[in-house]
């Protein structure tokens, strides 16, 4: 690969492009090529003993202020984020041979934002937020299914299912964003944006 003639991240390094703008371009392209869930990401958190855990979640919104996902606040990831608000995200779009890694600090979204997103979910999903005590042990599958039916009876009006207090969103405020582009003979392209002490993005090309 001739890095000087690259039309990928080398060009982005030379141009004055904001990492959020670049992410939006890549996400929009992934929506056209990925068969399933282009907004899927691996979310890494860690417990009080610094032992990491990782799982797939879905990105539901992003802008200059951060990257938003929703979850049960009492789940493993919810509890870990309460105790240690540092987290990492990794997007991998196999169809485009691209990857994005994002590190940062999380904070809960406002009740207004959480309410608006929750109300946009389907009835079954809203009921599930009540019925599932995420990450806790259950005796069998029927226990969960019975809980779902109980909440369906309680909230039979599909237009009136309130958001549980234990269900909300987290906004990851990025401190660094790295873009990775596959290259021939494993000579990949890596472009990293890091926020300086004044909140400005500083770009660096990394060796593959």
Curated annotation (Swiss-Prot):
Substrate binds at residues 60, 117, 121, 125, 186-188. FMN binds at residues 55-60, 70-71, 77, 99, 134-135, 180, 190. Binds 1 FMN per subunit. It is an enzyme of class 1 (oxidoreductase). Pathway: Cofactor metabolism; pyridoxal 5'-phosphate salvage; pyridoxal 5'-phosphate from pyridoxamine 5'-phosphate: step 1/1; Cofactor metabolism; pyridoxal 5'-phosphate salvage; pyridoxal 5'-phosphate from pyridoxine 5'-phosphate: step 1/1. GO terms for biological process: pyridoxine biosynthetic process. GO terms for molecular function: FMN binding; pyridoxamine phosphate oxidase activity. Its cofactor is FMN. PANTHER family: PYRIDOXINE-5'-PHOSPHATE OXIDASE, PYRIDOXINE-5-PHOSPHATE OXIDASE. HAMAP family: PdxH. Catalyzes the oxidation of either pyridoxine 5'-phosphate (PNP) or pyridoxamine 5'-phosphate (PMP) into pyridoxal 5'-phosphate (PLP). Belongs to the pyridoxamine 5'-phosphate oxidase family. Homodimer. This is Pyridoxine/pyridoxamine 5'-phosphate oxidase. It comes from Pelagibacter ubique (strain HTCC1062).
């Amino acid at each position: 690969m001739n890095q000087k003639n690259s039309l990928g991240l080398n060009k982005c390094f030379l141009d004055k492009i904001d990492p959020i703008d670049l992410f939006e371009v890549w996400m929009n392209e992934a929506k056209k090529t990925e068969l399933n869930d282009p907004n899927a990401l691996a979310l890494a958190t860690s417990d009080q003993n610094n032992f990491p855990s990782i799982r797939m979640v879905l990105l539901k919104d992003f802008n200059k202020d951060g990257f938003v996902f929703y979850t049960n606040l009492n789940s493993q990831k919810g509890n870990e984020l309460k105790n240690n608000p540092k987290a990492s995200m990794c997007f991998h779009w196999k169809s485009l041979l691209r990857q994005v890694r994002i590190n940062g600090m999380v904070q809960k979204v406002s009740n207004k934002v959480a309410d608006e997103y929750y109300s946009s979910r389907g009835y079954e999903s809203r009921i599930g937020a009540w019925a599932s005590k995420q990450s806790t042990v259950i005796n069998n599958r029927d226990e969960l299914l019975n809980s779902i039916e109980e909440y369906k009876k309680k909230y039979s009006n599909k237009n009136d299912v309130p958001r549980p207090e234990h269900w909300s969103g987290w906004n990851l405020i990025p401190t660094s964003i790295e873009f990775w582009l596959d290259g021939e003979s494993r000579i990949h392209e890596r472009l990293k944006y890091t926020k300086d002490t004044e909140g400005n993005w500083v770009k660096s090309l990394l060796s593959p």
